[in-house]
Regions:
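Subset of outer-membrane beta-barrel
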Residues: 20-319
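Positively charged n-region of N-terminal signal peptides that target proteins for export
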Residues: 1-6, 116
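Sec-dependent N-terminal signal peptides
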Residues: 4-15
Length: 319
């Protein structure tokens, strides 16, 4: 299975040749937010978790006009196993503000789990709704008669959304492939073909290894690759965890930023986790701002009965 992991990573990175920006919310602590990228992750860890993220990108960014500011993103999610059915269920809501454009999505995921080899293979689907809102009052066209910007106020449109994925995890490694926005959805805010904004399909590949050099120390390298088949981006990083209680790490986002991460687990069962990520922008600081900040909180609910055996987590810090 390790060979399969390596081959899949190489094919994904080599086969995608153009690296540019793309349409997707961005998270530095991606290893704690797997459900967002892949519906097949629903219920895989065998415990019910509640997770919340808040991200402020390019903090302190000053726009040329008005008070649009930088990008800010919030996500809340529920991830729960359905042990008697060998399956899992997930819910998440994402709010992504990008200047005059706001993306809001609400999604429900279901995954079925199969024992394969020494691990678990999960197949998942996701259905939901994706909303885009354009605030025309924030646009300042060079040409006042530009037909693309003749709207007034805030205009919203809602479209159905569908995603699917596959996820495999064993005791010491995991890998998943998610396929997002599989329905061909178009947002047409002017009512004609002059301002089409399609919801583009994305492929996301995630993976990681769990290595314990000592009894209390765990090292977990991981990666995230995203593509719309025209462009791609990748994150690669490593976390070090001590005594299942505190962690720290670094990651690199291609042509974008260097990230530092810290976190701490509270209570006897380590059920409450608080994490923080700091991004330092590496390129084009004159057009952005130098830093971004991200906060993560996750809480694992107690097991409901003695028969609900917790599944071995891989890596164990993930939620």
């Amino acid at each position: 299975m390790n060979k399969t992991l390596l081959i899949l990573v190489c094919i994904t990175i080599i086969g995608l040749t153009n690296s540019q920006g793309q349409q997707s919310a961005q998270f530095s602590q991606y290893m704690f937010n797997t459900l967002f990228y892949n519906p097949a992750y629903a219920g895989v860890e065998g415990v019910t978790t509640l997770t919340a993220f808040h991200r402020t990108q390019w903090a302190g960014y000053q726009p040329t006009l008005d008070n649009a500011g930088g990008i800010n993103t919030q996500v809340v999610s529920l991830n729960a196993p359905i042990l008697r059915l060998r399956s899992g269920f997930g819910l998440h809501i994402v709010n992504d503000n990008i200047g005059p454009l706001t993306n809001l999505e609400a999604q429900a995921s279901f995954a079925y789990h199969l024992g394969v080899g020494d691990g678990k293979l999960s197949l998942g689907i996701r259905v939901g709704a994706f909303s885009q809102t354009v605030d025309y009052d924030q646009y300042r066209p060079v040409d006042p008669d530009d037909e693309l910007l003749q709207g007034n106020g805030r205009i919203s449109q809602l479209r159905p959304d569908f995603s699917a994925g596959v996820f495999y995890r064993a005791r010491q490694y995991y890998i998943g492939v998610g396929f997002k926005h599989l329905i061909d959805s178009q947002f047409e805010f002017v009512g004609v073909d002059t301002l089409n904004n399609p919801l583009e399909s994305h492929i996301t590949v995630t993976g990681g290894l769990d290595y314990e050099p000592t009894y209390k120390v765990r090292l977990t390298p991981s990666f995230l690759v995203q593509s719309d088949l025209n462009s791609y981006s990748f994150d690669i990083g490593i976390l070090g965890t001590y005594d299942d209680t505190m962690w720290g790490g670094v990651s690199f986002r291609q042509q974008e930023a260097l990230v530092g991460m810290i976190g701490y687990s509270f209570f006897k069962e380590k059920s409450l986790k608080l994490g923080y990520a700091f991004d330092y922008t590496l390129i084009a600081q004159e057009a952005k701002a130098a830093t971004s900040h991200e906060i993560m909180v996750t809480y694992s609910l107690p097991m409901s009965s003695a028969n609900d055996k917790k599944i071995i987590r891989t890596p164990r810090f993930r939620q």
